[in-house]
Amino acid sequence: MPKQYLQLSNFAGGLNTKFDARDIKDDEITNVSNLQVYKPGQLFSSAPHTQVTTLAGTEPRLGYGIFLFKSDTQIDNTSALTEMLALADTTNSQIDIISDPFGTPAATYEIDLGTTTGGKYIYYYVDGALRTADANGGANNTANWYGFVKRGSSAFGGDINDWESKTNDLAAPGGENCGITDTGYAPTASNSGVGFDVDLSVSITDDDGLWEATTYEFAQSFVYEGDQESLLTTYPETVTLSVNNYFENVYVGLKSAFNERIKGGRVYIRKQGSNDLWTLFLDIDFERGVRKDFGAQDYHGFSATSGAAYSHTSFTDATCDTTNTDATVGHDDDDGAIKAGMWVTGTGIPTVPDATVSSVTSDTEFELSANATATNDPVTLTFHSGFTIKGPSIDTYESINGFSPDIGQISFGQSAGLFYKTVTVCNMRTFVAHVNYYKSTGSSEIKLMPDRILYTPPGKYDTFPPNQFIDIGINDGEDFTALESFGTKLLAFKNSTLYIIDVTSPDDMEWFLESTHNGLGVDKPAAVIRTEFGICWARKTGIYAWSPSQGIVELSAKLDKNLSPMTDITDPVIGYYPQDSHLLIIQNCGAASDALIYDFTTKSFTELGSYTSDAISNIQNDVDNTIFSLGTSIRTYSSAQGSTAWILETKDFDFGNPGVLKRPLKLIVSYSTSSGVTVTSNYYKDGDGAPDGLNSSTWATASNGGVKVIDLKGIGSVASLKFKFTATGNYQINDMTIVYRTIGKSPSTGQN
């Protein structure tokens, strides 16, 4: 028979341990270590991971602790796109923020979460702020908010332009020494940051007020970055209106300094002692001023002096005459501009409390609420005007926020020891699961609820009303372990079960459980990753992907669950490398481990042997890098060619004709290498379980077009033949050609 040729120029089918070595495709392989197969026509030795930076503190917990995020502002407050890396220091219960981790990395900030060590820190980043919590439930650790705040602040005479680290608590005003008064505002240090003073008068002269004649109570709130409103604190004072009365000369006074996350606040009103809804009375914005309701376009700006501020509009009159110890002030005709209740400032006007116009006695004279302290003829006085509020607003606390102010609690930063074990942001809401949180509406009881998912109102990523929850599989013997989202689908993983929930509708009453999948759960958040193709996850029994178009697909279908490398998956973490569309699965994050690489383009697996030398963190990626923490070193995955110890075992070739014997003559390998080393070649004959030695020699240095010819005549006749190659070096194999003759005899037991 003439010579025949079997050419193998593509190994992109990757690893296949599911089927018999004879039955797999020619482009598939039976065993591989440290060879990349994702480029058709090339098979090359892989590169090891490389160091990006090192940790200053102790390494993160297994499968937890690192997070990549980007900001438009650098740590030094310079406006420029920057990337940052959050690293957990579990010994000191801190998070180190590393700027420019892939350029010139530098530890620039530390976030302090408390005093309980050994935390499992998880993160989410949205609206320019990083949120951190201890999924391990450290009793003395508290959820944190870290973000850049840039805001003008006429209320305090200066702007905020800085990164802020704050407890992630949406605390209500303390309210100490803040009140509803009609004696003028005189802010003191005791008012600092605890709330808002409201100064007002009741108009009894006009008859066009729209308020019900009754006694009213008031409450105040803080508004935080992201327009997230706190619960309410009531004022001790009340105000009574008679028929047709209304409020006039309404001012807001405040004293710095507030938590930098607070951007303003609101004041509400309702009938005293009633269950009526709290109606908006004043909307306060530190940057723009105060308005009386959302429909009002005009803000009354703040004036600030020595850290105190009040809202107003104002005008001056340079014709005023004052007399020491006398409350009467004369002036030229002002055409009725000066009105009772106006706040008056100027030389000779008392300031504690601030004087107001108590009555206008004529076109050229008015009475102060207190005697002047100096005689001036003339003197310029400034008259400050507040709001006139003739009727109630249509806006209420519930209509603004979507929940009642009587909800009780709304944030994980409210108390140390509150936590969640997993988090994702989906359709403008934050979802957290397996929570230690307030049990129910209005309750202060904290309970661990492993079957509960909590979620925020739209756009309010730190606000968690206790009544906005999903309970699935209560007391089913499983806990929620991971959440991930894709589009408007929420994937909620328990230990063994996956729930897919449709959260498309803005109305949470229209959400529904789309499907339930048993046997597809995971053990931790780091076992799940979002990619451009969908959500991927790894568990001991397989590696899977879900997308809206294809549903659930087992990526590891060609890998036998009862054989290595699948049996080596014991504590997996998963990452994604966008540049080459690779999944990186490290099989055991708790010890030295091999890794699997899945290529989405070729739909193939390869294995990287001895990839990690110790326990690692979770895996993170940006568009260019995929990183993890190995000890105190941050390492990055590389898909490039490199020098390493590699193994390749081909399929068991029957040359397309298993029923006849073949006599192999030679093997021709086309390759390239920058430095030739010894490559050991072995063969398996007719499905033997143990290899026989074939050749061990140097494959010479060849930048291009290297050829290695290996004599096969000594093998004798075969029904099938498989090859194994091992080496430590930097090689690229382009193709293999087996030269053989068909003998024409049928194989028999013991035949050579």
Which residues make up each language-model segment?
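Surface-exposed loop/turn elements that mediate protein-protein interactions on large endomembrane-trafficking
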Residues: 94-103, 140-154, 444-470, 502-509, ...
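Beta-sheet repeat architectures centered on beta-propellers
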Residues: 1-108, 113-121, 126-128, 215-217, ...
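Small/polar beta-strand repeat architecture
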Residues: 254-264, 271-280, 285-416
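Hydrophobic or amphipathic alpha-helical targeting/insertion segments
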Residues: 112-183, 270-289
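N-terminal beta-propeller domains
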Residues: 1-103, 160-195, 200, 219-236, ...
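Conserved aromatic anchor
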Residues: 200-211, 246-263
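Surface-exposed extracellular loop regions of Gram-negative outer-membrane beta-barrel proteins
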Residues: 490-517
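Beta-strand signatures of extracellular beta-sandwich domains
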Residues: 219, 266-268, 343, 680-682
